[in-house]
């Protein structure tokens, strides 16, 4: 049973938040990078994090968990495994070997493209889409659009961290995507 192990924190969300390292001025001055590697290095924190997602989605009747390249690939397959559903990778352009569908999205300076195999899911499949964090929301929006173009029902967008000051979670919600994040950090 989730969180029943000895030494489990009384507030799992606060514990997860405390396990995320902030690296100032990386990758550029003024950015407060939220580093999940410290969370992942702790077996206790990783178990609690996975349990939080599993508890949320255990009764959602999902067919797949989709993960966004690259840090979404860390947690999404673990959650898919725990839920006994498939994992769908949504990759940066040119990384998938079979026939793909692609979706471009805007970045602060330029644009990027993600792809999905055209047979990754079928119409009516219920899917959540996961990443490590939501900043501007562009990558998750592109992933959602790809899944919907394949006919999937995108149940929710999920991430470990929300950076609400960057507006991504609001953008996604305004576009009709329900969003769940474990914790949030203010600022950039």
Curated annotation (Swiss-Prot):
It catalyses: AMP + diphosphate = 5-phospho-alpha-D-ribose 1-diphosphate + adenine. GO terms for biological process: adenine salvage; AMP salvage; purine ribonucleoside salvage. It is found in: Cytoplasm. The keyword Transferase applies. GO terms for molecular function: adenine phosphoribosyltransferase activity. Homodimer. Catalyzes a salvage reaction resulting in the formation of AMP, that is energically less costly than de novo synthesis. This is Adenine phosphoribosyltransferase. The gene is apt.
